[in-house]
A protein has these predicted regions:
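Glycine/small-residue-rich loop that forms an oxyanion/phosphate-binding "nest" at active or ligand-binding sites
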Residues: 1-17, 23
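Conserved acidic, metal-coordinating active-site core of Asp-based
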Residues: 22, 26-141, 145
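Mg2+-dependent phosphoryl-transfer enzymes with acidic/Ser/Thr/Gly-rich catalytic loops
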Residues: 112-195
Length: 195
């Protein structure tokens, strides 16, 4: 394997615009960014964190930058008016017919929006099938809602004990926190390696 993109599931221009329209009504505090492999645009009100330097100018309204399909729409409440869980609940209610909504951190007011029915779980299942593998051949670790579908799919899955409180309900087991080498300890057990 290399870093070649094997497949992309894009959100159409029309669906991006409709998602933003609905979410502006449901949660006016939210600002937006859109990204793909070769482009990233954000609203001026969207305060970047991990994506600092990708768009240093921004646009007033993201609708002005939505000109082609995107891999992801990011929604942020830059003043932390809502938690990520609260934002996902509202977005799920408003746009679940168009896209998949999740988040990857409880410590930031940020949601991630991808194409309908696309998640880590569906992507892992597709990749495994291409390689002739099944869920029984796979191990997954996760800590936040963006990992839940993957934890649910893999036959051996572990929620990080310091992750989102709902993660263990989707996993088959629980791993110690990363800081305590939780992933390494599980891998050693699975490979029957001495500790």
């Amino acid at each position: 394997l290399n870093d070649a993109v094997l497949e992309e599931w894009m959100i159409s221009v029309e669906d991006q615009l409709e998602v933003v329209r609905r979410m502006r009504i449901a949660m006016p505090e939210m600002s937006f960014a859109v990204e793909s492999n070769d482009h990233y645009h954000r609203e001026i009100a969207y305060v970047p964190k991990w994506d600092i330097g990708m768009d240093n100018v921004g646009v007033e309204k993201i609708e002005d930058a939505i000109k082609r399909p995107a891999l992801k729409i990011l929604g942020r409440c830059s003043n932390h008016e809502f938690t990520s869980d609260e934002m996902v609940a509202v977005a799920h209610r408003e746009v679940q017919d168009l896209v998949t909504v999740t988040h990857s951190t409880s410590r930031d007011s940020l949601i991630e929006i991808s194409a309908l029915n696309i998640s880590k779980g569906t992507s892992l299942a597709m990749m495994a099938q291409r390689l002739g593998l099944t869920a029984d051949d796979c191990v997954s670790f996760g800590d936040n809602p963006n990992d839940f579908s993957m934890l649910e799919w893999a036959s051996r899955s572990y929620a990080m004990s310091d992750g989102h409180p709902e993660a263990p309900t989707f996993a088959k087991g629980v791993a110690e926190p990363c800081e305590a080498d939780g992933v390494a300890k599980i891998i050693e057990q699975l490979l029957d390696l001495p500790a």
